[in-house]
């Protein structure tokens, strides 16, 4: 062995490399200054020989083979090559020859500021540093890999480009940061990879990339290298307008959400677990349907990659990768772009509460608890069998908040709906006594999760103005939608689970028994303005033997449809934004299942008239909602709602008014929750004028009997419901009737002024 090589060699690192334990390979491999000369070393298992050549190939140096394991070294008395400006020519035992740049000669692309910000939990573009990123370094094309694994003994990149051999590309640990990095030349898009991690206990595990931009199609679970910066967006006007939307603007705008699971909305091939339409195929179908129906937003379930179809996307393994079930990242970008082109906002279901135990996922990522809390009393959900994120660890909260920023910035997502917020807020959520760990004050509030959620909402508001975050929070936690500046959690909206539970229980009742449960109908107005609510009938309400919406309704066929029309009409009149799960707009009979399409055949079957009628009814409701701002403008302002009558439980009839931005086009709702036809029904009204029916759920085009009020009704000076005026109408059984009117102040009656007394001017007498 050349004496210079022997003197230069760090034999401890060499032994670690041979044993597969080296976490600092750049200190041993690559191009190193050595006095006035340089030392170039390489590790090429299964090779016969290795040479160093100039990029142009004119100069060639044979490397000395130090051992039979494939370690080579070359000492040059004078510096010939700068940095990575050389190539390695390796001849292998199978007769192949590979010419490539040296992975260990390239500079680290993660700076000290990146490390500092990540360790502090404040690096909102950390996804541009960690993960796998195709790029050019020193004129060489390849992919830069980086991963956070602080407990690991050694981390290697393995993939279809190196025979999945962990010995070939060990990564370099950056100081004490816990971040490993390596640039591998000639690895480009569509390369398949994982991280091979040697734990401190000597076990080798294979993990998917937490920051990977793309994953394989299940059941395969490796990552795929993708450049997500190439897509040319066409929604610049949409994005510019989005930036101008303030918190107050969002409250005043219509929000009518169609909740969707793309894989089961429509399938290309039924009875095939892989028979999905692609994102690009779905885009025009979804946009056309949603626009025609009059929805303003879609909410997408199951977009971040997940392994198990039955989880519906709520057990995520790849937070930065859209699922491959429907295409690659650019295909999903096209889908979002297409929605924006058609004026449709896109909401993404986002799951920062927990993650699954799949071996390739985040659990015990580097052989020890890393993303999850190390104490199982805080780190595991016994009911769900999942891990809970360690919200108090800076890098973990950074991973989650940066992910929210990522979807808004890189995929132009307009809003995130945070799943299972209650499970984050409470340390004892779903746990038995003795199986949870109290906070430092002895309570059950999760201070770390609270802090993370507040930071999430503040960060999104600052970095992505116009993007909002919705909480699915099922308890009475105060201040969920209060701004962070007021010590609230900072969410823009909260799902109104209380209204949903009470109202659905009310609607399930036989109409006779509704009179004894009248408070279930009216109680929600006691707290309707305590938060910024969205009224939801979500996927959770039409699964697990809860029945579809139509089959929750009591009665025979016609009564069920009449009840459902009444339910939807009352929902649209109630303060709060709206959300309805797919299939319920045309009264799907079966519960929803992720394995099959919605039952679209009902619209062409023997009972098509009923299903088309309810679909047309929801469509009409949606378009009226978008037309009259009384439906939404004052959702968060008490002046936007006023009861006319809510205290007549025996008749189960309620009436109320909704006010918009002006005195014009205000709305009067009259809702009959019994099967009693009431012709000549009197209802008090707020003012004089004409009341024009704009919706009657009993109209024939909706599947009703046609008992409507075709002519405008004039308010009469007959006091009723504590009002000075009233109208007399036909109120069909099990119906909602909506009237439009222009509010007019009562003109004061002019009173005759008292006649002024006149005194005849006296004429003085002549003397």
Where are these predicted regions, by residue range?
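C-terminal beta-strand-rich structural cap/linker in extracellular carbohydrate-active enzymes
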Residues: 82-85, 189-193, 711-747
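Surface-exposed beta-strand/loop patches in extracellular or lumenal glycoproteins
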Residues: 40-44, 50, 148, 155, ...
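Substrate-binding/active-site clefts of carbohydrate-active enzymes
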Residues: 214-216, 236-255, 261-445, 766-767
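Intrinsically disordered, polybasic Lys/Arg-rich low-complexity tracts
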Residues: 746-767
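Conserved, mostly hydrophobic/aromatic
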Residues: 42, 147, 195, 260, ...
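The feature marks proteins involved in alpha-glucan
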Residues: 1-35, 58-62, 66-149, 174-259, ...
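Conserved alpha/beta catalytic core and glycan-binding cleft of carbohydrate-active enzymes
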Residues: 412-414, 432-594, 626-698, 705-706
């Amino acid at each position: 062995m050349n004496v210079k090589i022997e003197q230069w060699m760090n034999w401890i690192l060499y032994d670690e490399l041979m044993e597969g334990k080296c976490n600092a390979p750049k200190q041993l491999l690559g191009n190193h200054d050595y006095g006035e000369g340089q030392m170039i070393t390489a590790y090429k298992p299964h090779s016969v020989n290795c040479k160093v050549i100039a990029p142009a190939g004119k100069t060639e140096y044979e490397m000395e083979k130090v051992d039979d394991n494939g370690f080579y070294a070359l000492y040059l008395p004078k510096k010939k090559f700068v940095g990575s400006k050389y190539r390695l020519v390796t001849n292998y035992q199978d007769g192949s020859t590979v010419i490539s740049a040296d992975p260990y000669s390239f500079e680290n692309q993660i700076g000290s500021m990146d490390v500092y910000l990540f360790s502090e939990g404040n690096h909102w573009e950390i996804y541009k540093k960690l993960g796998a990123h195709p790029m050019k370094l020193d004129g060489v094309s390849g992919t830069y890999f980086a991963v956070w694994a602080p407990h690991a003994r050694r981390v290697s990149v393995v993939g279809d480009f190196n025979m999945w051999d962990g010995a070939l590309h060990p990564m370099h640990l950056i100081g004490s940061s816990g971040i490993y990095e390596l640039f591998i030349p000639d690895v480009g898009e569509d390369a398949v990879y994982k991280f091979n991690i040697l734990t401190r206990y000597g076990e080798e595990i294979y993990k998917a990339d937490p920051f990977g931009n793309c994953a394989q199609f299940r059941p395969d679970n490796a990552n795929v290298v993708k450049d997500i910066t190439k897509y040319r967006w066409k929604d610049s006007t949409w994005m510019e307008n989005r930036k101008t939307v303030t918190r107050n603007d969002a409250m005043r705008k219509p929000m009518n959400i169609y909740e969707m699971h793309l894989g089961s909305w429509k399938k290309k091939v039924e009875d095939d677990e892989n028979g999905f339409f692609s994102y690009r195929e779905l885009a025009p179908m979804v946009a056309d349907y949603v626009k025609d129906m009059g929805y303003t937003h879609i909410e997408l379930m199951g977009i971040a990659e997940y392994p198990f179809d039955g989880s519906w996307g709520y057990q995520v393994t790849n937070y930065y990768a859209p699922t491959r079930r429907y295409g690659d990242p650019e295909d999903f970008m096209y889908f979002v772009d297409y929605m924006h082109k058609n004026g449709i906002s896109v909401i993404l279901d986002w799951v920062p509460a927990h993650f699954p135990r799949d071996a390739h996922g985040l659990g015990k990522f580097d052989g020890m608890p890393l993303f999850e809390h190390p104490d199982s009393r805080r780190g595991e959900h016994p009911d769900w069998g999942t891990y809970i994120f360690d919200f108090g660890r800076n890098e973990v909260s950074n991973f989650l908040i940066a992910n929210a920023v990522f979807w808004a910035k890189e995929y132009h997502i307009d809003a995130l709906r945070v799943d299972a917020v209650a499970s984050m807020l409470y340390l004892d959520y779903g746990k038995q006594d003795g199986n949870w760990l109290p906070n430092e004050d002895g309570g059950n509030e999760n201070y770390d999760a609270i802090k993370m959620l507040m930071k999430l909402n503040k960060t999104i508001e600052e970095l992505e103005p116009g993007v909002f975050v919705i909480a699915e929070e099922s308890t009475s936690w105060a201040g969920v939608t209060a701004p962070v500046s007021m010590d609230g959690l900072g969410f823009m909206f909260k799902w109104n689970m209380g209204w949903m539970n009470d109202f659905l229980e009310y609607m399930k009742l036989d109409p006779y028994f509704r009179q004894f449960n009248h408070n279930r109908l009216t109680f929600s107005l006691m707290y309707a303005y305590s938060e910024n609510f969205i009224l939801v009938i979500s996927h959770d309400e039409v699964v697990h033997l809860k029945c579809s919406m139509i089959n929750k309704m009591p009665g025979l066929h016609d009564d069920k449809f009449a009840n459902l029309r009444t339910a939807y009409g009352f929902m649209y009149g109630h303060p709060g934004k709206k959300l309805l799960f797919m299939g319920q707009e045309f009264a799907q009979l079966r519960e929803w299942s992720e394995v099959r399409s919605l039952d679209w055949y009902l619209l062409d079957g023997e009972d098509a008239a009923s299903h088309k009628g309810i679909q047309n009814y929801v469509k009409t409701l949606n378009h009226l909602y978008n037309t009259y701002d009384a439906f939404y403008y004052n959702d968060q302002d008490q002046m936007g709602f006023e009861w006319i009558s809510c205290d007549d439980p025996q008749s189960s009839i309620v009436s109320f008014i909704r006010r918009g931005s002006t005195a014009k086009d205000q709305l009067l709702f009259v809702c009959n929750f019994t099967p009693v036809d009431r012709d000549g029904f009197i209802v008090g009204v707020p003012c004089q004028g004409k009341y024009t029916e704009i919706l009657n759920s009993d109209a024939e085009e909706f599947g009703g009997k046609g008992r409507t009020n075709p002519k405008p009704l004039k308010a009469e000076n007959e006091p009723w419901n504590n009002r000075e005026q009233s109208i007399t109408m036909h109120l069909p059984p099990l119906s909602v009737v909506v009237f439009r009117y222009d509010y007019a102040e009562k003109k004061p009656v002019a009173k005759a002024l008292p006649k002024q007394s006149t005194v005849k001017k006296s004429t003085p007498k002549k003397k």
